[in-house]
Amino acid sequence: MTIQHTQDLAQIRAMVPEMRRVKCIHFIGIGGAGMSGIAEVLLNEGYEITGSDLSENPVTERLVSKGATVFIGHQASNVEKASVVVVSTAINEENPEVMAARELRIPIVRRAEMLAELMRFRHGIAVAGTHGKTTTTALVTQIYSEAGLDPTFVNGGLVKSAGTNARLGSSRILIAEADESDASFLHLQPMVSIVTNIEADHMDTYGGDFETLKQTFIDFLHNLPFYGQAIVCIDDPVIRELIPRISRQVITYGFSDDADVRIENYHQEGQQGKFTVVRKGRANLDITLNIPGRHNALNASAAIAVATEDDIEDDAILKAMAGTQGTGRRFDHLGEFDTGNGHAMLVDDYGHHPTEVDVTIKAARSGWQDKRLVMIFQPHRYSRTRDLYDDFANVLEQVDVLIMLDVYAAGEKPIAGADGRSLCRTIRSRGKVDPIFVPEIEQLPSVLANVIQDGDLILTQGAGDVGKVAKQLANLELNINKMLG
C-alpha cells in the first residue's frame, strides 16, 4: 500500500501551534547520542536550543556550529532562559539544573517525551530491541532517503552516510531509535514499530523480572494504532513466544522458514554480506549489504520489511543496501595501521552485551578467516558484568588474543568479583585463551607493542572509552612505536 508522505514541515508545525509558545529548550546532558539528536532536529525546526554537559566533544561542537548554546558543567544559571528542560535517565534529581528548574517551575520532560512530541503528527517508525536498534534505524533511513522521501531521523549513533545521528527532513516521516533501557519508549506512538530481539538487559529498570520486560515490549507494540504494523524478528525465541499476545498486524522477518520476509543463502565476502530476501507477493531481492555479519542481514531484512509494506521501489532498496556505510562504532572498519612489523586491520565496535560481542566475533571470523583475532575488551557497567558474567566468559574465550581492560563504570559503584581482573582469572582457568589484564587504558600502547603481529585483525570492543584507543590507532600518522614515544 502506497502512503502519501509529502506533507511539508509548515503543515506539521501548524498542527501544534501551542508548541510555538516554547521559545528555549534546554537539554541537560546534551552531548549524549540520544539527547543531541533531538536537540539538533529541534534546532533545525527553529527553536532556541541550550544545553549543558560535563565536557566538550565532537557532538557538542557540532551543535554549537549550528547555533546552539552549550555550557560546560552543570549550574543553576544555565536554565534561566528555558521554557522547558529535557533530561535523560542519567540525570538525577540532585542535579543543580534540575533543582533550579523545579524552583523556577520550568517543566521538566524526559528525552522520550520530547521525541514523542516530534513524532505525534508524523508517520513514525520506531526501532526497538535489545540489539541492532542503531544499525536497523540507519538502514531504514538509508532506504527512505534513497527513495527520495527525505525522512527526519533520530538515531543513537552516527549514520555514516549522513555524517550525523539526526537530521530534519522535509517529509512527514520520522524514523527513530526507541530506548527500552528505562522503559521510556512507552511514550512513543508510532505508526510502525520494529522489535529486533528481546534479552535480559537493563534489568534494574524492570525489577529484575524478565516477564515485566517482555510485557513492556508488548505494551510498546500496543501503542501502535489498530491500523499500525509490528515488524518483528521471528528468529528470536522470546519474540516467537510473544507473537500470539500481540493484538496488532504482525509482519515477521528472519532466517526461519515461516518468516514473512525470509533470508536465504547468506554468505560473507570480506566486508559484504550477500543473501536473497524472499517476500510474500513480491519479487525476491538479491542483496549485497555493505556491512558484514548474519546479524546485519537480520537488521537489513527488518528495514526491507518496512519498505516493502510502504511500497518503496525495489531499486531504492537494493541501492541503499549496497551503498550503506553503516553506523559509527558498529563493526566500524577503520583501516590498517603500522605495527612496526607490518600492518594490522582495525575494527571498532560498540557492542557491550555478550550477544553483541558474539556476533561481532562471528562476523570477523567469517570474513577474515586467515587472520589472528585480537580483541581489546572493556566491560561496561559492574551490574552488567555481574549479571552476565558466565556469558561474557563463554564469548570472550573464542578469540585468539584477549586484552582485557577494567570495567567502564558509567557512574556505578564497584561490585566485588564483577571486574575485569576477575573475568580474566575465570577465562584463564578454562584454558582456551590466556587473557592479558590492563588495569589502566593508558597502558595499552606498551602492551600492544608486544602483542600485535603483521596481519592481525584487532577488535576494540565496548561502550566505554575504548573507542578512543581505536581512533588513536586509526591515525595512520602513528604506529605502535610512536605511540610509546
Swiss-Prot record:
S-S bridge residues: none
Any Pfam family hit: Mur_ligase_M
InterPro entries for the chain: Mur-like_cat_sf, Mur_ligase_C, Mur_ligase_C_dom_sf, Mur_ligase_cen, Mur_ligase_N, MurCDEF_pg_biosynth, UDP-N-AcMur_Ala_ligase_MurC
Single GO BP term: cell division
Enzyme Commission no: 6.3.2.8
Presence of the UniProt keyword ATP-binding in the record: yes
Pathway in which this enzyme or protein is active: Cell wall biogenesis; peptidoglycan biosynthesis
Residues at which ATP binds: G129, T130, H131, G132, K133, T134, T135
Catalytic activity: UDP-N-acetyl-alpha-D-muramate + L-alanine + ATP = UDP-N-acetyl-alpha-D-muramoyl-L-alanine + ADP + phosphate + H(+)
Transmembrane segments: none
Compartments where found: Cytoplasm
GO molecular function: ATP binding; UDP-N-acetylmuramate-L-alanine ligase activity
Source superkingdom: Bacteria
Entries under HAMAP family matching the protein: MurC
Family named by the database record: Belongs to the MurCDEF family.
Summary of the function given for this chain in its UniProt record: Cell wall formation.
Protein known as: UDP-N-acetylmuramate--L-alanine ligase
Organism: Vibrio parahaemolyticus serotype O3:K6 (strain RIMD 2210633)
Gene from which the chain derives: murC
